A protein has these predicted regions:
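Phosphate-binding core of ATP-grasp and ATP-grasp-like enzymes
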Residues: 175-229, 234-267, 271-279, 291-304, ...
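Active-site nucleotide/adenylate-binding loops and adjacent lid/helix of ATP-dependent enzymes
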Residues: 105-194, 198-217, 221-244, 357-358
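A conserved FAD-binding loop/helix module that cradles the flavin
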Residues: 281-283
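Short glycine-/aliphatic-rich beta-strand segments at the starts of folded cytosolic domains
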Residues: 307-317
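An anion-binding loop in the catalytic cleft
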Residues: 343-356
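Residue-level detector of structured alpha->beta connecting loops
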Residues: 33, 72-73, 143, 177, ...
Length: 360
């Protein structure tokens, strides 16, 4: 179902998922006079406290989904593992953005890599693994070092294991429960970057400046903007992002993770949602990725992605959130706390953006 006309202030955006991304989407929507209705199964969802309404129910609860659909004007989501049946159920009743095609493509790593490669965009060598024979065939083709990942689910390093020359592929497959998988060749990259792009219902596209990302224990720690890469490399990455978002007939903000290896840009994966590596836009741009996503799904004109400051975004993980008082006192720091009840090890509890004058 398509959105017929732009949604005026006072309309309601439905959001599947109640984590920090939904929370920041709801806060951005409120600035535009739009209401948000959060649908999530967890009672302590951080987004509940900042939304006009919420429904706590399972994603499989069709009665609750039907009521939710009747109370909103458009539906979006904060995470890519929305059950396919849930997306299909809602898409028949209310506009869903991004649509199910993008969702289903990103949910399966083999389909995702096949789609990207089909556009002529470089990806790591890959092969599907479904049984012992296909594992042996994939291993013979890809070799080591390589990474075995579940085809579905998994983020921040979950659902994957590395294979080196002294480690059997069979043991790696056992580590991930012998689930359907993808074997990817290791990319000897120089830097990790991402592209944060938006596309509206009318096909307009806006692409932000490219962040350079640093991970610790498979979890994003910092995003530095501008990325310390050649201008030609950054422009190539932005063009790749535009190609992907257009080919998906996408509506909303997308995060595309990439590797830089020499002069080459290699796409790693797609996240059909606002993205952690785009949090810097909240304070270094006039229009953040969260407002941009709301604008896009509601049929509003896209805002300018222009950056007014250089910035380093740093995630606050686990107990690091207890440093909030010191961070709040720093004049060049913009602090964002997610309101989560428990600071578990590795859990994203907040982030801060450190701004400096724009140099380039």
């Amino acid at each position: 179902m398509q959105l017929a006309t732009p949604l005026p202030p006072g309309s309601t955006v439905g959001i599947l998922g109640g984590g920090q991304l939904a929370r920041m989407l709801a806060l951005a929507a409120g600035r535009l006079g739009l209401n948000c209705h959060i649908f999530a199964p967890e009672a302590d969802s951080p987004a509940f406290s900042v939304a006009a309404a919420h429904t706590q129910a399972a994603y499989s609860d069709e009665d609750a989904l039907a009521r939710f659909a009747s109370q909103v004007d458009v539906v979006t989501y904060e995470f890519e593992n929305v059950p396919g049946l849930t997306a299909a159920f809602l898409e028949q009743r209310v506009p869903l953005a991004p649509g199910s095609r993008a969702l289903f493509t990103a949910q399966d790593r083999v389909d995702e890599k096949t789609f990207i490669a089909g556009l002529g965009i470089p990806v790591a060598p890959f092969a599907a693994v479904a049984d012992d024979d296909s594992l042996a065939s994939a291993f013979a083709c890809i070799g080591t070092p390589s990474i075995l990942k579940t085809r579905r689910f998994g983020y921040d390093g979950k659902g994957q294991t590395a294979i080196s020359g002294n480690r059997a592929a069979e043991a790696a497959w056992a580590d991930i429960g012998k689930q359907p998988a993808i074997l990817e060749g290791f990319v000897n990259f120089d830097k990790e970057i991402s592209v944060i792009a938006a596309r509206s219902w009318d096909g307009s596209i806006a692409v932000y400046d490219v962040p350079e990302n640093h991970h610790e224990h498979h979890i994003l720690k910092t995003s530095t903007v501008p990325a310390r890469i050649a201008p030609e490399t950054a422009e190539n990455a932005r063009k790749i992002g535009g190609t992907i978002i257009a080919a998906l007939d996408y509506v909303g903000v997308i995060g595309i993770e990439m590797f830089v290896a020499g002069d080459d840009v290699i796409v790693n994966e797609i996240a059909p949602r606002v993205h952690n590596s785009g949090h810097w836009t909240m304070d270094a741009c006039a229009v953040s990725q969260f407002e941009q996503h709301i604008r896009a799904v509601c049929g509003w004109p896209l805002g300018s992605p222009t950056r007014h400051s250089d910035v380093v975004m740093t995630n606050l993980l686990g107990d690091e959130i207890h440093d909030w008082q010191r961070l709040a006192a720093l004049p060049d720091v913009c602090l964002h706390v997610y309101g989560k009840s428990e600071a578990r090890r590795g859990r994203k509890m907040g982030h801060f953006n450190r701004l400096t004058s724009r140099q380039a």
